[in-house]
Amino acid sequence: MKRLLITICGRAGSKGFKNKNLKNFCGKPLVYYSLSAAELFIKKHSELEIDVALNTDSEDLARLVAAEYPEVIYLPRGAELGGDRVPKVEVYKDSFARMETRTGKQYDAMIDLDITSPLRTEQDIENAFAKAQEREDLQIIFSVCEARRNPWFNMFKIVGDHAEMVIESQFTGRQQAPEVYDVNASIYVIRRAFLVDNPDPILWHSKFGVSVMMDTGIIDIDSEHDYLLMEAIAQHLYAHYPEFNACLLYTSPSPRDAHES
């Protein structure tokens, strides 16, 4: 792969946590952490041609990004892609097609970096990209964390008036069960063929691989509690893990205090 598109995608609204994509995280705009990780990755790969695009229906988010990253191409999101029931893959396909039309380029793959994953390192992106380079037969690489629960051992579902194992098994110890992973939504590496030729709206209806990240570095931010917990974890990671601190130090402070809200 020689030509890549990096995307940052975020909606204006969020039912669980209002304006979460505009929040400051540890004193800096949340979106800047993904952009700084992308910039560090780009600086390490001068042999690649890489463009960065922001797909959003939030003018506030677009202005915030443009203030410090004017090279990022803004793709205003249409109303048809703004709802919370729109499959993520439709936004990816929209971004990919519009960028190819706009730039006249044919990208080999897209790397999507989720805004609500500020504790992602440049090496995490490197690992996912390397896996995609090694395995040309895989259409998608998902970033994942080792799961703390296992459907073969300690996960239940409600069936009528009682509970049952999610997957029936005879395992008596977690170590006996197959290893499973949580998809953490931090990084997706998706080949062009999937985005252009595949009509299926479900990402895992493909041949895919995984790239493992540190589990404590990723929490789904769906509430104020999640956000505060991630900030507390961040302080520990910044103090003890230089690879996390690199993105923090490379991230600009907020240009406008208004984005605290």
Task: Locate each region found by the language model.
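N-terminal nucleotide-binding beta1-loop-alpha1 segment
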Residues: 1-18
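A short, N-terminal amphipathic alpha-helix
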Residues: 30-49
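Short beta-strand/loop segment that forms part of the nucleotide-sugar
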Residues: 49-57
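Short phosphate-binding loop-to-helix
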Residues: 59-109, 127
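Conserved core of the sugar-phosphate nucleotidyltransferase
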Residues: 90, 109, 118-207, 211-213
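Short aromatic-hydrophobic micro-motifs that form the base-stacking/packing surface
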Residues: 111-113
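Conserved alpha/beta core of the MobA/IspD/sugar-nucleotide pyrophosphorylase nucleotidyltransferase superfamily
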Residues: 181-252
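Single conserved hydrophobic/aromatic residue that forms the stacking wall/gate
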Residues: 250-261
